[in-house]
From Swiss-Prot:
<comment type="similarity">
    <text>Belongs to the peptidase S37 family.</text>
</comment>
<dbReference type="GO" id="GO:0006508">
    <property type="term" value="P:proteolysis"/>
</dbReference>
<keyword id="KW-0378">Hydrolase</keyword>
<comment type="function">
    <text>Has proline-specific tripeptidyl aminopeptidase and tetrapeptidyl aminopeptidase activity. Activity is highest against tripeptides containing an Ala-Pro motif. Involved in the final processing of transglutaminase, by removing either the tetrapeptide Phe-Arg-Ala-Pro left after TAMEP or SAM-P45 hydrolysis, or the tripeptide Arg-Ala-Pro left after SGMP II hydrolysis in a single step.</text>
</comment>
<protein>
    <recommendedName>
        <fullName>Prolyl tri/tetrapeptidyl aminopeptidase</fullName>
        <ecNumber>3.4.11.-</ecNumber>
    </recommendedName>
</protein>
<keyword id="KW-0964">Secreted</keyword>
<dbReference type="InterPro" id="IPR029058">
    <property type="entry name" value="AB_hydrolase_fold"/>
</dbReference>
<dbReference type="InterPro" id="IPR008761">
    <property type="entry name" value="Peptidase_S37"/>
</dbReference>
<dbReference type="GO" id="GO:0008239">
    <property type="term" value="F:dipeptidyl-peptidase activity"/>
</dbReference>
<keyword id="KW-0645">Protease</keyword>
<feature type="signal peptide">
    <location>
        <begin position="1"/>
        <end position="27"/>
    </location>
</feature>
<dbReference type="Pfam" id="PF05576">
    <property type="entry name" value="Peptidase_S37"/>
</dbReference>
<feature type="compositionally biased region" description="Basic and acidic residues">
    <location>
        <begin position="462"/>
        <end position="477"/>
    </location>
</feature>
<dbReference type="GO" id="GO:0004177">
    <property type="term" value="F:aminopeptidase activity"/>
</dbReference>
<feature type="region of interest" description="Disordered">
    <location>
        <begin position="448"/>
        <end position="477"/>
    </location>
</feature>
<keyword id="KW-0732">Signal</keyword>
<feature type="propeptide">
    <location>
        <begin position="28"/>
        <end position="33"/>
    </location>
</feature>
Amino acid sequence: MRKALRSLLAASMLIGAIGAGSATAEAASITAPQADIKDRILKIPGMKFVEEKPYQGYRYLVMTYRQPVDHRNPGKGTFEQRFTLLHKDTDRPTVFFTSGYNVSTNPSRSEPTRIVDGNQVSMEYRFFTPSRPQPADWSKLDIWQAASDQHRLYQALKPVYGKNWLATGGSKGGMTATYFRRFYPNDMNGTVAYVAPNDVNDKEDSAYDKFFQNVGDKACRTQLNSVQREALVRRDEIVARYEKWAKENGKTFKVVGSADKAYENVVLDLVWSFWQYHLQSDCASVPATKASTDELYKFIDDISGFDGYTDQGLERFTPYYYQAGTQLGAPTVKNPHLKGVLRYPGINQPRSYVPRDIPMTFRPGAMADVDRWVREDSRNMLFVYGQNDPWSGEPFRLGKGAAARHDYRFYAPGGNHGSNIAQLVADERAKATAEVLKWAGVAPQAVQKDEKAAKPLAPFDAKLDRVKNDKQSALRP
């Protein structure tokens, strides 16, 4: 009886947090211009204030919002999901950003936010700490639950920010923005997804093999492969250094099993990581095959990162690897040039990076469903990729009549995993910028007459628009 009463109480509290329409509407009705934006947000049930950081021309708030652990059974527990608000004006459009990982608590602005000169809501992905339910029921970490998190936060904030909304994100964040539109297609007026991989069939990854056969020039590809092999030929010497470094820095290898296994993963990432974060012009930095072990060690650490497969490096990203091994899929690349020097064939797959007490079963079909929706039913979708980014090997595909639905896919020439609209060729840059402005409802008359006139509405801000160093020290989108 006591347990039932607690469950009923929890359900009633959550229903109050969800707002059942009336509570949110009541909070939103306080729309007097003089009302403080923080006070207006805090009147929404489930909102908590964490901190505010000053930034000229904006209000920047760090908040949490109470979410159900399971959106299908909202009475079965809640957790606090962290998000930030870069507030400009309620009369401006709002961009909903997510990285698909943790949220930064320092003021920043995504490219679409600068283009439309709007507000930005940035949300932390569920299960990335501190936005993790306790205890953690990992079966509730899937793309629908995460999309439903975004949907609820959007519903809570829409009465305050009533103008048009766009969704955006890069890499896993671009995937997240796409999944959000698939499950809640009417929430956003448009979506800008950057460098978002689309692993429709996890067992068929030949597109990546083709990519690595053609990326950059032949000399660079050949030298990278040679150095990758040499790193494994000198394995024993380098692993001894690796173990010494780990001991001195308190790093352990319980999840992957040993420093030797971790090292093989690090080396397997080497070529992928080079193209993910570097350019053809950086090929001159690739050491000679006969380089000293010191040079080789430094190059491997600079490109792949020795910390990535330690327990401490993996822990933060357990939610990603769980998703990769249950729904998202993960790339598998053939490495014929490494024949005879691999000790653990097949080790570089998601199950290797998730603690064994967390059960994982791959559920095929989730990515194929999203892929079908994008090709057949999506509208107002913009996908931006980098020509030399490995994750572009399996991009989202546009179906028949894409242009009529205002769906676009552009590639930044020579671009890597940091590619954006600004790096597109002139005509595509103008088209993409014009579409974003139109979706947001703020396209100037000049742009409506001639899309070539399209440019960001907000001036560049060196701090707010700085290029983030989101480099992952392991193979992650």
